Amino acid sequence: MSIFNLTDEKMKETSSTFTAHEIYQQPATWRKTCAQLAACKDELQAFIDQVVKQDDFDIVLVGAGTSEFVGNSLFQALNPKYNYKVKSYASTDIVPSPENFLSRTKPTLLVNFGRSGNSPESLGNVEAAEVVCQNLYHLFVTCNHEGTLSKMAASRKNCFAINLTPETHDQSFAMTSSYSNMYLATYLALNLDLSLIHISEPTRLL
């Protein structure tokens, strides 16, 4: 199979097999992500509304490494819609000093990005926030349905997990389809009122 005019032999020789495949597969995975969001939109909207229907609230996007970049990219697009209540922080900053970033009393939607859903900083971020925040909801966006974040969502009422399809759990050093799908899923999740037509017909979105 040839991808970007690279043969299997060339990709093996240059150790680029995973990276090339994961870049190439992105349009197909985006359509699957759109379909996923369309399938759970009512349940997801009800969960998010517990926060955003309040008079005042915070939406806090958190991740480490490339997962932090997802939040840094998203908050600029989301802020106008949510009256500039969206923030983006590194989970590695929140873990040691959550009180410097999170409100103790304000309703807070903590959106946690984690490719594996198992990293110490992702899990530590959840527990640190629980200690500080009195009115906290977690939205986990992960590429691993078997990860700890996903399992946590199944057992806690204040958690919701968007488990992206297995092929988005990139194996290459560079996060490509995992990054773009976590971005897309979160953008759609926080724009369900504007996206209903498009996510029910994903070819129009893409």
Model-derived features: where do they sit?
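An N-terminal, well-structured beta->alpha segment
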Residues: 4-54
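General structural feature for long, well-ordered alpha-helical segments within catalytic domains
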Residues: 15, 19-22, 26-29, 40-43, ...
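Generic detector of well-ordered secondary structure
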Residues: 24-25, 32, 80, 187, ...
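Short, flexible loop segments at the rims of nucleotide/cofactor-binding pockets, characterized by
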Residues: 35-39, 87-89, 116-117, 204
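Glycine-rich phosphate-binding loops that contact phosphosugars or nucleotide phosphates
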Residues: 53-197
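Single conserved hydrophobic/aromatic residue that forms the stacking wall/gate
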Residues: 197-206
